[in-house]
């Protein structure tokens, strides 16, 4: 029977080291892990203390890491990476997005290998962008090949770097995050912004799919990846209810009690403003969460309206 690695199973707390711990997912996951009885520390480029969390400085670009950072660590959760939606995708920025993920993963593996650290698991973020940003009606699962666009390339190279841990005999889990729903610092907060003018807006033709997930469910998936010793490989972290952008905005309007402006933001406007990055908004895939649910995972928020109501009105 597979071992369930809950923090309470041991006399000493199991230790989780998180990269990107100050980001959206990292903050929520840290709280979840602490509440679940784990010891949590962060790797940060600044090394600035974050409440009760011990923070170790690292700088993968110059291959520096605090020598004490990995002492006694049982799990690494790797979330760090340059924000995909923060800046326009110049050639330089696109390189930063890839290198911040791939090189940091390779550096972590090098340090773990050289020091002979025995991890219980290495858990890395990825994204449903692995499948590319096509406008097809295909439902993608973990057996599908990566997309041939930029986001597909980013995720492919990131996951290949993560597989270095698997090749070293360390249980490796790659979590392909969907669009994370959270009120203050997520894609949802941007979609809600027009509401201050009294309405919501659609973008493009509205037919693009939005593989979404509530932040609570996403943190629970990462917790499962830590606890369940037979969980390995890639998993799509998206809610089972598949919706288009137009459907999403309609439900959001209903929850917020705001009308949807009848004229969408034209695709050419977004392409002019955002360049290639507009594809993230204008295209999207249907993504299956069947493999995850087959592990026994139960979503707390499988329904979009319930998820939005909890986040906005809860």
Q: What are the functions of these language-model segments?
A:
Residues 1-10, 14, 279-314:
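C-terminal amphipathic/interface module of NAD(P)-dependent oxidoreductases
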Residues 10, 228-276, 309-314:
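Mid/C-terminal beta-alpha module of Rossmann-like enzyme folds, strongest
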Residues 14-36:
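N-terminal Rossmann NAD(P)H-binding glycine-rich loop of SDR-like oxidoreductase domains
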Residues 56-104:
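NAD(P)H-binding glycine-rich loop region in Rossmannoid oxidoreductase-like domains
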Residues 106-149:
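Conserved Rossmann-fold NAD(P)-dependent oxidoreductase catalytic core, especially the SDR/UDP-sugar
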Residues 156, 168-170, 180-190, 225-235:
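Glycine/proline-rich active-site loop of Rossmann-fold NAD(P)-dependent oxidoreductases
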Residues 192-200, 208-242:
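Alpha-helical substrate-binding/gating segment
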């Amino acid at each position: 029977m597979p071992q369930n690695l809950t923090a309470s199973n041991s006399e000493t707390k199991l230790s989780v080291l998180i990269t990107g711990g100050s980001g959206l997912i990292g903050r929520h996951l840290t709280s979840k892990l602490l509440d679940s009885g784990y010891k949590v520390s962060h790797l940060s480029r600044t090394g600035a203390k974050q409440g009760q969390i011990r923070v170790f400085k690292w700088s993968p670009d110059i291959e520096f890491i605090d020598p004490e950072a990995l002492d006694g660590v049982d799990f690494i959760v790797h979330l760090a990476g340059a924000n995909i939606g923060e800046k326009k995708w110049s050639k330089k920025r696109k390189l930063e997005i890839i290198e911040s993920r791939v090189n940091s993963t390779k550096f972590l593996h090098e340090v773990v290998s050289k020091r002979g650290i025995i991890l219980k698991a290495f858990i890395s973020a990825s994204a449903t962008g692995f499948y590319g940003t096509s406008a097809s009606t295909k439902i993608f699962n973990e057996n599908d090949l990566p997309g041939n666009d930029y986001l597909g390339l980013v995720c492919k190279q990131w996951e290949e770097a993560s597989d270095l841990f698997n090749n070293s005999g360390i249980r490796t889990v790659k979590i392909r995050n969907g669009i994370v729903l959270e009120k203050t610092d997520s894609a949802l907060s941007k979609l809600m912004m027009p509401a201050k003018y009294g309405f919501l807006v659609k973008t493009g033709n509205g037919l693009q799919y939005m593989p979404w997930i509530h932040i609570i469910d996403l943190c629970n998936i990462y917790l499962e990846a830590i606890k369940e010793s037979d969980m390995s490989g890639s998993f799509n972290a998206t809610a089972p209810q598949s919706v288009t952008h137009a459907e999403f905005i309609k439900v959001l309007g209903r929850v917020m009690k705001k009308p949807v402006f009848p004229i969408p933001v034209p695709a050419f406007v977004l392409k002019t403003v955002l360049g290639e990055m507009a594809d993230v908004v204008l295209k999207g895939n249907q993504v299956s969460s069947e493999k995850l649910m087959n592990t026994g995972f139960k979503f707390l928020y499988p329904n979009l309206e319930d998820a939005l109501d909890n986040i906005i009105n809860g």
